[in-house]
């Protein structure tokens, strides 16, 4: 859901986002957005609230909302009355934090820190270490948009692990309020005195404010007496100025038609990605072309025929890369993705697809073009994409990468690990060192130089089991027994529940992390093989 604004102003230490007509101002509080309308004559302006609400563990229960209400009462916050009878907005969850005394303490904050272990488990469906950060929105200053998430981003404060939200706990909602919470009322008093009122035309229609719906569901309107309204007053009908407008994504960029079937006679369009206005990211159809035909296109004895000199070099380069990384079908090399029943070139295609999808530089488009040239020359029919096969391949490599990175993050949380003699090969040791350094460089709050030989050895132990194709949980269990860090098993179990196709900010963050880890492992492997250091 998106709310647009024209300008910002600072008033009483609050950032207000003022709409184009200057009759409405938004402000952020504890992951939610409050909207205040300009008073008219003696009538106060419309007050509304947008954001995530917590509900229950199933489609028809309100366990989580009731838990928050109960905790608020036990902590003596009787004056806090969450809106509605069933849901509790995210900013009320803030009040369970012992460091927060009222909504005033979470003004201008997009997220909520949850220290309550029971509530954190409700939100993530997992036992977590204390401290998760739940983000309900972001302000896109370059677009002048306040974006409210349909699904929150939940991150562990200590490990930075990104969780998938429980499916029934959160929902996007909007509510009409009779007044603001008492702690916030003084912040908006006199706000519009400093904002010039626009001159209304004589034939002015009733004002409206568009709320752009970008998710699959429109925010649920909540009818209630409002936060801190002081008792259950008489219900009355209200007419809101807000109008929900559904945003429909364009199927593809302007001027781009879907990729033609392989037997199309137009040679210029037969090669996926050859159009001048190609989409910025790879498509599953392109991956399927490579997945289906790469072994024939690059491995056949006469695969080089009819190609330019540069294309011949590219074909040989891809064959060499696939062998250096993954070996051959008869003699697979110990590396990530070993448990996948794929050929080396298929693994390479999925590897580059995941990296390229996150806008990182990769030769995936060149690989697609080469395979397209082959299917064009030989009239090879490529069937419709097998989505389950592609999903299994992508998720397998995606989860392997995330599991390796998550294990490195968990190990780096410990300055001292038990010294043990853990035999690790030179390739695995190089991978382990590179991955730890990459993750350490991303942890800005932690000073550098904390990577020890034990960190390298134990991550190497994890990678050795993973590279042998024995599975992520086997690798986590083996490493947990060596180190005594049992949280590794839980963390990798969390990874196994993630998908490369998860929606929302959390899914995007996981894909970015996985692509980064794969990029690091690819770089160090190819660099070592180029210098003849691979063992």
Swiss-Prot record:
Residue stretches spanning the membrane: none
InterPro entries, per database record: Herpes_UL21
Location, primary (coarse class): virion
Pfam families for this protein: Herpes_UL21
Any one annotated GO CC term: host cell cytoplasm
Subcellular locations according to the entry: Virion tegument; Host cytoplasm; Host nucleus
Spans annotated as Disordered: 251-279
Effect on the protein of changing residue 40 to Y: In strain: Nonneuroinvasive mutant HF10
Keywords noted in UniProt: Host cytoplasm, Host nucleus, Virion, Virion tegument
Homology family: Belongs to the alphaherpesvirinae UL21 protein family.
Oligomer status and interactors: Interacts (via C-terminus) with UL16.
Function: May participate in DNA packaging/capsid maturation events. Promotes efficient incorporation of tegument proteins UL46, UL49, and US3 into virions. May also play a role in capsid transport to the trans-Golgi network (TGN).
Protein name as catalogued: Tegument protein UL21
């Amino acid at each position: 859901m998106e709310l647009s604004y024209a300008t910002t102003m600072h008033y009483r230490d609050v950032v207000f986002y003022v709409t184009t007509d200057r009759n409405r101002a938004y402000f952020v509080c504890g992951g939610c957005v409050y909207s205040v309308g300009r008073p008219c004559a003696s009538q106060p302006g419309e007050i509304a609230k947008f954001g995530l609400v917590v509900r229950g563990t199933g489609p028809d229960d309100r366990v989580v909302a009731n838990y928050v209400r109960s905790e608020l009462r036990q902590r003596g916050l009787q004056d806090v009355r969450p809106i509605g009878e069933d849901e509790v907005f995210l900013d009320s969850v803030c009040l369970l934090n012992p460091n927060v005394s009222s909504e005033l303490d979470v003004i201008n904050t997009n997220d909520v820190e949850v220290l309550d272990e029971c509530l954190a488990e409700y939100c993530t469906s997992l036992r977590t270490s204390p401290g998760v950060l739940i983000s309900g929105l972001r302000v896109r200053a370059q677009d002048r948009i306040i974006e409210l998430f349909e699904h929150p981003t939940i991150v562990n404060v200590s490990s930075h692990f990104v969780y998938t939200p429980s499916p029934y706990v959160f929902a996007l909602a909007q509510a009409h309020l009779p007044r603001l919470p008492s702690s916030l009322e003084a912040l908006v008093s006199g706000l519009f005195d400093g904002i010039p009122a626009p001159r209304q035309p004589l034939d002015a229609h009733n004002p409206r404010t568009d709320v752009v719906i970008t998710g699959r569901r429109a925010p649920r309107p909540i009818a209630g007496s409002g936060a801190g309204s002081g008792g259950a007053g008489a219900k009355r009908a209200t007419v809101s100025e807000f109008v929900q407008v559904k945003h429909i994504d364009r199927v593809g960029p302007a001027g781009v038609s879907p990729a033609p079937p392989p037997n199309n006679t137009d040679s210029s369009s037969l090669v996926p990605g050859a159009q001048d206005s190609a989409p910025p990211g790879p498509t599953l159809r392109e991956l399927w072309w490579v997945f289906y035909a790469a072994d024939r296109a690059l491995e056949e004895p006469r695969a080089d025929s009819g190609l330019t000199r540069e294309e011949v070099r590219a074909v040989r380069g891809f064959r060499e890369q696939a062998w250096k990384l993954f070996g051959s079908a008869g003699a697979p090399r110990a590396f990530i993705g070993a448990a996948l029943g794929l050929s080396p070139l298929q693994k390479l295609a999925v590897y580059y697809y995941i990296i390229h999808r996150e806008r990182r530089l990769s030769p995936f488009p060149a690989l697609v073009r080469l395979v397209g040239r082959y299917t064009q020359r030989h009239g090879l029919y490529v069937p419709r994409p097998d989505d389950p096969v592609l999903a299994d391949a992508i998720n397998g490599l995606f989860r392997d990468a995330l599991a390796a990175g998550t294990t490195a993050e968990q190990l780096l949380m410990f300055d001292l690990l038990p010294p043990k003699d853990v035999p690790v090969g030179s390739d695995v040791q190089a991978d382990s060192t590179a991955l730890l350094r990459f993750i350490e460089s991303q942890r800005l709050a932690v000073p550098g130089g904390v990577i020890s030989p034990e960190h390298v050895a134990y991550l190497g132990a994890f990678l050795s089991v993973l590279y042998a194709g024995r599975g992520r949980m086997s690798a986590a269990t083996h490493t947990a027994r060596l180190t005594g860090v049992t949280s590794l098993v839980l963390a990798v179990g969390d990874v196994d529940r993630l998908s490369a196709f998860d929606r929302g900010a959390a899914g995007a963050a996981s894909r970015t992390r996985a692509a980064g880890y794969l990029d690091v492992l690819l770089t160090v492997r190819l660099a070592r093989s180029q210098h003849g250091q691979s063992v």
